[in-house]
């Protein structure tokens, strides 16, 4: 255990606006929020593990989260029937401000500065259609599957231009696993 652990801290700012229109038949509620969190409990990645044991967690992460919420309601009456319709939506985007991570060879591989849960992967560049494409001298060498490619296999972009398709070519892609809407 780590005797220096503390509670995670959060600083939040919310600004809301509620209003009614058309004799209170239409009501709208909006909230804009900004949250900064630090002392997030996380494992260290920059200290070597010599004996194979997991190191204790530390309070060392920080993150920003911001967005809005919108709620719209329509209340009315047709004859003797009262009805209401309601819709809501929200949008939130987070950014990892600090994560204890080993410096990567290329900045595009860092998780700090990206959304929490960001996926990384290779950029698809079509398929190998013939043996001539596979046997071309200028084709990047694949670090996987012993570089044994066949027509129909996927082609990937050599992002760092080192002549190899490997983990150094993985870039942030798509959305994170944390929904925004």
Descriptions of predicted regions:
Residues 1-121:
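Extracellular/periplasmic, surface-exposed regions of secreted and cell-surface proteins
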Residues 37-38, 175-177:
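A short local loop/turn or secondary-structure capping micro-motif enriched for an aromatic residue
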Residues 77-176:
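Conserved small-residue
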Residues 180-181:
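C-terminal substrate/ligand-recognition segments
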């Amino acid at each position: 255990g780590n005797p220096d652990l503390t509670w995670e801290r959060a600083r939040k700012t919310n600004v809301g606006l509620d209003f009614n229109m058309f004799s209170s038949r239409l009501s709208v509620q909006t909230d804009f929020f900004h949250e900064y969190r630090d002392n997030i409990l996380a494992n260290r990645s920059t200290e070597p593990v010599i004996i194979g044991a997991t190191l204790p967690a530390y309070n060392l992460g920080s993150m920003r989260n911001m967005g809005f919420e919108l709620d719209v309601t329509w209340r009315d009456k047709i004859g003797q029937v009262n009805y209401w319709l309601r819709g809501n939506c929200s949008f939130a985007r987070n950014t990892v401000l600090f994560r204890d991570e080993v410096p990567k060879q290329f900045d595009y591989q860092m998780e700090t500065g990206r959304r929490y849960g960001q996926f990384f992967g290779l950029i698809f560049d079509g398929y190998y259609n013939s043996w001539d494409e596979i046997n071309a001298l200028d084709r990047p060498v694949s670090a996987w599957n012993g570089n044994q490619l066949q027509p129909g296999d996927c082609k990937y972009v050599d992002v760092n231009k080192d002549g190899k398709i490997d983990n150094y070519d993985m870039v942030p892609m798509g959305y994170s696993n944390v929904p925004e809407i």
